[in-house]
């Protein structure tokens, strides 16, 4: 990996920025990651790992990983998370309890073999049991693999619980290349979401005094553009393309970990995604990949923010508000461009393509800003609803 945790930390140190230590001991991305994971366990003298996976990720990687570990003398066992009625595993109370009660007493480390939801379940279970956990992604689909926060569905509400980051991450490109194209496209969509999250972060700094880091913004922006520039290779699933996407997702996650907040990588587009997810959960509808929702939300929100930046009513706000809004949002790529990038990576380009109705998107534009105590363009639009909301919510 080109950007190690030490590299990330040194960028913040050069800036003199306050940061939290990144306590991830090893990150390996490559065709030999399974073997490296075995060596890591042997070095740590951990002999009773539990692999947490779902039915799909067990077949994709969990079974082979368990065989590899057992061949190396490690007594690996597994917990296969059951699907819910809607057809996929969910990080909710039922699943969390199921995982905890199925962890053997002698477990000394937990391995998350899956994508975002499996990691959220695993990190919470590891935190509750006081155990380390290792990340073994099966798809380059989200930037949360290295996160210390676990976004869970508690009482039907998306709630992030602070837990722990993985002690190590091993991403096997032979596994990642075989991931469904939709999941790779979701990872690309999660990265494209940084277009609006970085703009929202600038707004939160200038208008709400929220913490900001130039170094963090540059690291995430560089990772974003690596993905945009190599979107063809990512879409084709080449080893180089998958490596670039996975590294970008990990860099984004490490920046959040160092800053101890998610502002550089999660703005209004993520709030919209979370709102839609919760509404679909209430309706017992099948879940949609996180990155697919984020990418579509980014395209919608970028156009919304660009309209805000040139809105005739902007003149009624204080001058420093106008300047900040125009500086952050005028130069964003338009939604059509973002949709084109999403499509070129093999993903959905608009909410219609993933079955999300326009009225739900409109509701999200009106209410999603209430999900997080964070200042974004959505906050501005809805706190000044008499000026902007009716037009921009369309």
UniProtKB/Swiss-Prot annotation:
Entry GO MF terms: glycerol-1-phosphate dehydrogenase (NAD+) activity; glycerol-1-phosphate dehydrogenase (NADP+) activity; metal ion binding
Family annotation (Gene3D superfamilies): 3.40.50.1970, Dehydroquinate synthase-like - alpha domain
One cellular-component annotation, GO: cytoplasm
Chief location: cytoplasm
Compartmental location: Cytoplasm
Cofactor: Ni(2+)
List of residues binding NAD(+): 54, 116-120, 138-141, 147
Binding site for substrate: 143, 190, 274
EC number: 1.1.1.261
Catalysed reactions, as listed in the record: sn-glycerol 1-phosphate + NAD(+) = dihydroxyacetone phosphate + NADH + H(+); sn-glycerol 1-phosphate + NADP(+) = dihydroxyacetone phosphate + NADPH + H(+)
GO BP, one annotated term: glycerophospholipid metabolic process
Sorted UniProt keywords: Cytoplasm, Lipid biosynthesis, Lipid metabolism, Metal-binding, NAD, NADP, Nickel, Oxidoreductase, Phospholipid biosynthesis, Phospholipid metabolism
Annotated positions binding Ni(2+): 190, 270, 290
Co-factor note (free text): Binds 1 nickel ion per subunit.
Function statement: Catalyzes the NAD(P)H-dependent reduction of dihydroxyacetonephosphate (DHAP or glycerone phosphate) to glycerol 1-phosphate (G1P). The G1P thus generated is probably used for the synthesis of phosphoglycerolipids in Gram-positive bacterial species.
Family under the similarity heading: Belongs to the glycerol-1-phosphate dehydrogenase family.
Subunit organization: Homodimer.
Name of the protein this chain belongs to: Glycerol-1-phosphate dehydrogenase [NAD(P)+]
Natural source organism: Bacillus velezensis (strain DSM 23117 / BGSC 10A6 / LMG 26770 / FZB42)
């Amino acid at each position: 990996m080109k950007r190690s945790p030490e590299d990330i930390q040194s960028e913040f140190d050069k800036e003199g920025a306050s940061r939290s230590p990144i306590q991830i001991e090893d990150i390996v991305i490559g065709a030999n990651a399974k073997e490296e994971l075995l060596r890591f366990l042997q070095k740590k003298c951990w002999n009773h790992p539990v692999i947490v996976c779902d039915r799909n990720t067990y077949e994709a990687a969990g079974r082979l990983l368990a065989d590899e570990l057992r061949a190396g003398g490690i007594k690996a066992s597994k917990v296969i998370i059951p699907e819910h009625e809607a057809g996929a595993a969910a990080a909710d109370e039922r699943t969390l309890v199921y995982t905890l009660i199925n962890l053997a007493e002698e477990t000394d480390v937990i391995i998350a073999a899956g994508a975002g939801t499996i990691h959220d379940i695993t990190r919470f279970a590891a935190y509750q049991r006081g155990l380390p956990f290792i990340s073994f992604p099966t798809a380059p689909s989200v930037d949360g693999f290295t996160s210390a926060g676990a976004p869970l569905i508690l009482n039907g509400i998306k709630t992030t619980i602070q837990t722990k980051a993985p002690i190590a991450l091993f991403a096997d490109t032979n596994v990642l290349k075989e991931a469904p194209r939709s999941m790779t496209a979701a990872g690309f969509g999660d990265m494209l979401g940084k277009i609006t999250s970085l703009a929202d972060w600038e707004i939160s700094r200038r208008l709400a005094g929220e913490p900001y880091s130039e170094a963090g913004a540059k690291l995430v922006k560089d990772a974003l553009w690596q993905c945009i520039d190599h979107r063809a290779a990512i879409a084709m699933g080449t080893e180089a393309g998958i490596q670039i996407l996975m590294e970008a997702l990990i860099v984004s996650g490490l920046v959040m970990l160092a800053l101890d907040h998610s502002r550089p990588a999660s703005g209004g587009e993520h709030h919209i995604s979370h709102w839609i997810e919760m509404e679909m959960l209430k309706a017992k509808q099948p879940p949609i990949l996180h990155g697919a929702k984020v990418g579509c939300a980014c395209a919608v929100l970028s156009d919304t923010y660009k309209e805000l930046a040139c809105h005739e009513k902007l003149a009624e706000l204080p001058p420093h508000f106008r300047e900040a809004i125009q500086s952050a949002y005028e130069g964003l790529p338009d939604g059509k461009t973002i949709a084109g990038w999403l499509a070129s990576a093999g993903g959905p380009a608009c909410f219609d393509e993933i079955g999300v109705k326009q009225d739900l998107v409109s509701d999200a534009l009106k209410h999603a800003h209430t999900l997080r105590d964070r200042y974004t363009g959505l906050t501005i639009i809805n706190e000044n609803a008499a000026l902007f909301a009716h037009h921009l919510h369309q």
